[in-house]
């Protein structure tokens, strides 16, 4: 089984661009204290914005639909929410450092079934140095890894703080490449 084919010119790509805008503007620092709170907050927002997407918003909090799972390594893995049956998978992770590695691995699994994968990595107050180091360029290997996932694998990552950041610091470090925008791939993550 290979990865689901994905073109960056389709209704799924249009949904991906809208989702990018939504994630960048979502107030993660006010949403909750655990992964389930963040998932519920974002899912509720996406459900209320469903008319902006061409694909159905499917979440685990909406009992009228079911998120499709991916079977890999003898286990079913299910993203937190999707746009469409095979279009876009969204996975939120409330991060400790080990959780970061697990989330990247899950992104690969979901890419088997879905055209695009959005990983939203929510950094806890206790792990704020991960966010600060990524913001200041000290986490170059992590930045390069997330950039590579975006440019070659269609796995788009967003690193967001679950805490209020200092003035002048970004509220979201996103790795999403849109060829419609001007700018080079080297600017990924710098928006």
What is each of the regions a protein language model found here?
Residues 82, 109-111:
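Short, charge-rich binding segments
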Residues 94, 106:
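Catalytic toxin/effector domains delivered as secreted proteins or via bacterial secretion systems
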Residues 88-90:
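Structural motif
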Residues 42-54, 145-153:
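Hydrophobic, Leu/Ile/Phe/Ala-enriched alpha-helical segments that form helix-helix packing faces
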Residues 1-13, 73, 144-191:
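Non-catalytic C-terminal interaction segments of nucleic acid-processing enzymes
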Residues 1-51:
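Interdomain/boundary linker segments immediately adjacent to catalytic/signaling cores
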Residues 28-43, 52-86, 97-101, 165-173, ...:
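Active-site metal-binding core of divalent-cation-utilizing nuclease and nuclease-like domains
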Residues 96-101, 111-169:
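Nucleic-acid nuclease catalytic cores
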């Amino acid at each position: 089984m290979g990865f689901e084919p994905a073109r960056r010119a389709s209704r799924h790509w249009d949904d991906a661009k809208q989702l990018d805008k939504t994630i960048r503007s979502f107030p993660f620092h006010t949403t909750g204290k655990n992964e389930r709170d963040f998932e519920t907050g974002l899912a509720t927002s996406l459900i209320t914005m469903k008319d902006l997407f061409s694909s159905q918003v499917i979440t685990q909090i909406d009992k009228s639909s079911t998120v499709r799972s991916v079977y890999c390594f003898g286990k079913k893995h299910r993203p937190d929410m999707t746009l469409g049956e095979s279009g876009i998978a969204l996975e939120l992770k409330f991060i400790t450092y080990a959780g970061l590695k697990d989330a990247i691995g899950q992104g690969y699994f979901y890419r088997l079934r879905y055209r695009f994968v959005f990983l939203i990595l929510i950094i806890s107050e206790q792990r704020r140095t991960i966010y600060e180091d990524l913001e200041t360029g000290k986490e170059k290997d992590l930045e390069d890894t997330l950039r590579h996932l975006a440019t070659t694998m269609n796995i788009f990552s967003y690193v967001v703080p679950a805490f209020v950041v200092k003035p002048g610091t970004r509220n979201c470090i996103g790795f999403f490449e849109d060829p419609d925008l001007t700018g080079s791939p080297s600017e990924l993550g710098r928006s």
